[in-house]
Amino acid sequence: MYDGQPIFNIIDSSNLQDRRELKLVLIHTENAYRSSAQRSLIASQRSWINFIINTDVPIDPAKDEVVKCSRKVACCPDPTDIPFDILNVSLLYVYCSFQEMRRYAQQRFYDGVSDGGAVISTVPPYAEGITKQTMRLWQKKVWQNTSKETHDLDAYIALLPNLRFKIQISHI
């Protein structure tokens, strides 16, 4: 029996102007998400995968590959009581346009693909001395070989990386 997908509420911080208040909200949200992931997310993923595997319906090869991949991503390959492998590291912030952020929020999924020149960084939005001009410089350096346009960086999403998250580092 599949228990259903847990949903972690999206936090809208667009009305917060004070960097200290934003920092407190993001720290609280990060702690709540880490706790929620440990408590219910991985159990739900395992439940879903076990539900698919234990059905008597033959699984076609394409779906079988999805299940195998999902087992790996969901940290499910053996023992089922292993803790969710969330790294004890900083959040990653995907700085992008408001439209892109809204699309990710509606999909509740970030696929790592940006058509708008997103910048991913560990620098939080409440950091002192970080301005739009600084972000634009980062954006130009990161996207210099692929885009001549300057895209909006008016919004962000915060990601909590886990062990399966592949990071390509570009020092700016």
From Swiss-Prot:
Keywords assigned: Crown gall tumor, Plasmid
Entries under Pfam families matching the protein: RolB_RolC (PF02027)
Superkingdom in the source lineage: Bacteria
Protein name listed in UniProt: Uncharacterized protein 1
Species the sequence originates in: Agrobacterium tumefaciens (strain Ach5)
